């Protein structure tokens, strides 16, 4: 039996962490099979070690392609250790970021090119794609303003040093992904109050996978 792989994407400040913190317990109350929440970069011991290297603010000399390769390496290990075993058991895996993040941040933001980053990650994942991706959409400046307003509540990382232009390129790359993958990616208006965003995510998942729910 093959499980169900769902990913969450969005620009910085979209509120994925807050949404998932509320959404996951709601899903767990209604689904028929075990549900696993994980994240990228990270999600497994080796992957978390790579995450620390990627996000360390001291690593300002990191080359864009080095960064992209590290994300892909972290993803591969996470896939082998966590995602694939859970899916093989028929479970649900919900992942905070996956390949789309690399395409947007390194392909778009770092200007490596979406196609090059996608090919790199297709090798890392052996072509595994989510069955559904929920994209939490907020205007770039709104997301950055949210980050600033919560700067005392979150750990500062290397991506926080990036310019507005970088984040605009990331957003543009995400918009292209949505257009190119209309069956897989569903855009959710994340400027709405948290309860409405969570409700929209819950409804999208239940409509797409009614067989998973009691």
Swiss-Prot record:
The keyword Amino-acid biosynthesis does not apply. It is an enzyme of class 2 (transferase). SUPFAM superfamilies: P-loop containing nucleoside triphosphate hydrolases. Pfam families: Thymidylate_kin. Keywords: ATP-binding, Kinase, Nucleotide biosynthesis, Nucleotide-binding, Transferase. The gene is tmk. This is Thymidylate kinase. Phosphorylation of dTMP to form dTDP in both de novo and salvage pathways of dTTP synthesis. InterPro entries: P-loop_NTPase, Thymidylate_kin-like_dom, Thymidylate_kin_CS, Thymidylate_kinase. ATP binds at residues 10-17. It catalyses: dTMP + ATP = dTDP + ADP. Gene3D superfamilies: P-loop containing nucleotide triphosphate hydrolases. Belongs to the thymidylate kinase family. GO terms for molecular function: ATP binding; dTMP kinase activity. GO terms for cellular component: cytosol. It comes from the Bacteria. The keyword Membrane does not apply. Its EC number is 2.7.4.9. PANTHER family: THYMIDYLATE KINASE (PTHR10344), UMP-CMP KINASE 2, MITOCHONDRIAL (PTHR10344:SF4). Transmembrane segments: none annotated. GO terms for biological process: dTDP biosynthetic process; dTTP biosynthetic process; dUDP biosynthetic process.
């Amino acid at each position: 039996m093959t499980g169900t792989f769902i990913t969450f994407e969005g620009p910085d400040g979209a509120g994925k962490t807050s949404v998932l913190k509320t959404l996951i317990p709601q899903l767990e109350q209604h689904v028929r099979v075990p549900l696993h929440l994980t994240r990228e970069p990270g999600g497994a011991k080796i992957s978390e070690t790579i995450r620390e290297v990627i996000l360390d603010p001291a690593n300002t000399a990191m080359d864009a392609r080095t960064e992209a390769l590290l994300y892909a390496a972290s993803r591969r290990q996470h896939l082998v250790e966590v995602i694939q075993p859970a899916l093989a058991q028929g479970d649900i895996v919900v992942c905070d970021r996956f390949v789309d993040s690399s395409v947007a941040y390194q392909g778009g933001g770092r200007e490596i090119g979406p196609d090059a980053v996608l090919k790199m990650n297709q090798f890392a994942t052996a072509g595994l794609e989510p069955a559904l991706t929920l994209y939490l959409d907020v205007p770039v400046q709104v997301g950055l303003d949210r980050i600033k307003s919560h700067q005392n509540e979150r750990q500062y990382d290397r991506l926080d040093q990036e310019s507005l232009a970088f984040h605009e390129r990331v957003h543009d790359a995400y918009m292209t992904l949505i257009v190119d993958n209309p069956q897989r990616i569903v855009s959710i208006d994340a400027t709405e109050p948290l309860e409405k965003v969570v409700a929209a995510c819950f409804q999208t998942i239940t409509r797409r996978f009614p067989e998973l729910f009691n």
